[in-house]
Regions:
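Residues at the starts of beta-strands that form the adenosine-phosphate
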Residues: 21-22
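Rossmann-like adenosine-cofactor binding region
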Residues: 30-126
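Active-site flanking residues adjacent to catalytic metal/cofactor-binding acidic residues
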Residues: 3, 113, 137
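Short, well-ordered alpha-helices that flank and scaffold nucleotide-derived cofactor binding pockets
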Residues: 14-18, 101-102, 156
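Conserved acidic E/D residue at the C-terminus of a beta-strand in Rossmann-like folds
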Residues: 27
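C-terminal helix-to-coil terminal segments
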Residues: 119-174
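Flexible, glycine-rich phosphate/dinucleotide-binding loops
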Residues: 9, 31-32, 142
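Glycine-rich adenosine-cofactor-binding loop
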Residues: 1-17
């Protein structure tokens, strides 16, 4: 399920579709997006509850609005199947973080997050210490030389990883 069918949601859907995943898009304007490439099905927010129990992956790519603020809460998360995943590349306030932590302790398989209700994420947040949570910076912009710097950092860290050396920029929980 991809919640948000703007340019980012559409790009994500095309990638998931290429991997033979059944992609359900959630949007405010179902009629406008009914034939959008990459989506097998398009539904509105009111119909979303029917699709949640069959959803293995929820990808948030929506704007923060009155409708999406706190959308991913305990009621939503409790309907997801055992072992499902949440990916948030939207806005932190779309997710109730306390409810997410509870769901991760009970039945979610994991979460991939680059946005949080309060940024930066508090150093004492339990999300930092959860082994099935991936946290990354929310970077939408690039600068001259960005790709080269990322490639060099990746290669350096790959070499370090393969030789058992510490990685650069790795966060270690205290």
């Amino acid at each position: 399920m991809v919640i948000g069918m703007g340019p980012i949601g559409q790009k994500i859907a095309r990638i998931l579709s290429a991997m033979d995943m059944h992609v359900v898009g959630v949007t405010r304007d179902e009629a406008k997006h009914r034939t959008t490439e990459g989506f097998n099905q398009v539904i509105d927010f009111e119909s979303m509850g029917q699709a949640i129990p069959q959803t293995q992956y929820v990808v948030l790519a929506c704007p923060l609005t009155c409708q999406t603020h706190g959308l991913i809460n305990g009621a939503f998360l409790s309907q997801l199947p055992q072992g499902s995943f949440l990916i948030n590349v939207a806005r932190g306030q779309v997710v109730n973080q306390n409810d997410l932590v509870e769901a991760l302790h009970s039945h979610l398989g994991g979460a991939f997050l680059d946005v949080f209700a309060t940024e930066p994420l508090e150093s004492d947040s339990p999300l930092w210490r959860m082994p099935h949570v991936m946290i990354s910076p929310h970077t939408a912009g690039h600068f001259t030389g960005y790709a080269e710097k990322v490639a060099l950092l990746f290669m350096h860290n790959l070499n370090n990883y393969l030789s058992g050396q510490p990685l650069l920029n790795e966060w270690q929980p205290s």
